[in-house]
């Protein structure tokens, strides 16, 4: 707050959940509007689509302080005929506490922050992935086990832990990307080759481990030819 008056800020941290499948996320099938499921706690929102039926993993969206409200239904948050430029709940400075079954799942935390003149505060939002043993998926019927989420959210509720994690991540990528550096005299070309191309090659390698001859990429993973190409892209990074 850089003014001389006390301020109250309504802060919304909001993101959309995927449906675990790139094809489902991109197609207009009625089935996609029937499967979404979420759970909610005071500081953590959970995405558990198809968890009961055939998954042992879930996603979560956490914040490191108490909230004034939350929502998991995109239609409720945006409003009738609404869009992301002016969500109806933001305009109303409120929350509906919507816990979705079907339709379009989101995670939205609503915080009210009081700032004295000259004061600043830091809020940490955490997007994560949790997994449970298949024989220990539920705490009770319909309620997922959340040990991974609770442990990770507690760890990174401390700003010092977040700073340390980002510093470690920076050192990790510096060690990988420093294996090769282009100095062309063209800043944009250097940035593309030295950072983004190498980063993309490394991520693609980590995600492409299938030895199939027929896979198409989006629907069933990566194919054998694609995986061979990935090898050439990262060999200079971790020879």
Predicted regions, residues:
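Short beta-strand segments enriched in hydrophobic/aromatic residues
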Residues: 15, 127-129, 234
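Beta-strand-rich interaction surfaces with strong enrichment in secreted/lumenal proteins
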Residues: 96-100, 110-115
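A conserved hydrophobic secondary-structure block that centers on an alpha-helix together
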Residues: 1-3, 104-105, 116
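Substrate-binding groove/exosite segments of carbohydrate-active enzymes
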Residues: 102-105, 174-239
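A generic structural motif
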Residues: 1-4, 129-131, 236
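Short Pro-Gly-centered flexible turn/kink motifs
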Residues: 7, 113-131
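Polysaccharide-binding surfaces and accessory modules of carbohydrate-active proteins
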Residues: 2-92, 134-174, 178-179
């Amino acid at each position: 707050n850089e003014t001389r008056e006390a301020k109250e800020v309504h802060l919304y941290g909001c993101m959309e959940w995927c449906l675990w499948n790139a094809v489902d996320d991109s197609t207009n099938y009625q089935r996609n509007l029937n499967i979404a499921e979420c759970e909610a706690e005071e500081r953590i929102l959970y995405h558990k689509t198809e968890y009961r039926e055939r998954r042992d993993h879930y996603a979560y969206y956490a914040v490191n302080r108490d909230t004034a409200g939350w929502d998991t239904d995109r239609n409720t948050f945006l409003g009738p005929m609404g869009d992301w430029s002016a969500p109806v709940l933001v305009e109303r400075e409120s929350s509906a506490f919507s816990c979705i079954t079907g339709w379009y799942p989101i995670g939205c935390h609503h915080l009210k922050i009081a700032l004295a003149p000259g004061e600043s505060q830091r809020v940490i939002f955490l997007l994560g992935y949790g997994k449970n043993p298949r024989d220990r998926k539920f705490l009770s019927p319909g309620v997922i086990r959340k040990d991974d989420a609770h442990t990770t959210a507690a760890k990174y509720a401390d700003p010092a832990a977040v700073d340390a994690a980002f510093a470690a991540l920076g050192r990790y990528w510096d060690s990988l990307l420093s294996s090769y550096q282009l100095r062309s005299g063209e800043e944009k070309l250097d940035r593309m080759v030295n950072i983004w191309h190498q980063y993309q090659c490394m991520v693609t390698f980590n995600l492409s481990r299938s030895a199939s001859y027929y896979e198409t990429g989006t629907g069933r993973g990566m194919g054998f030819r694609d995986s061979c190409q990935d090898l050439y892209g990262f060999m200079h990074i971790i020879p």
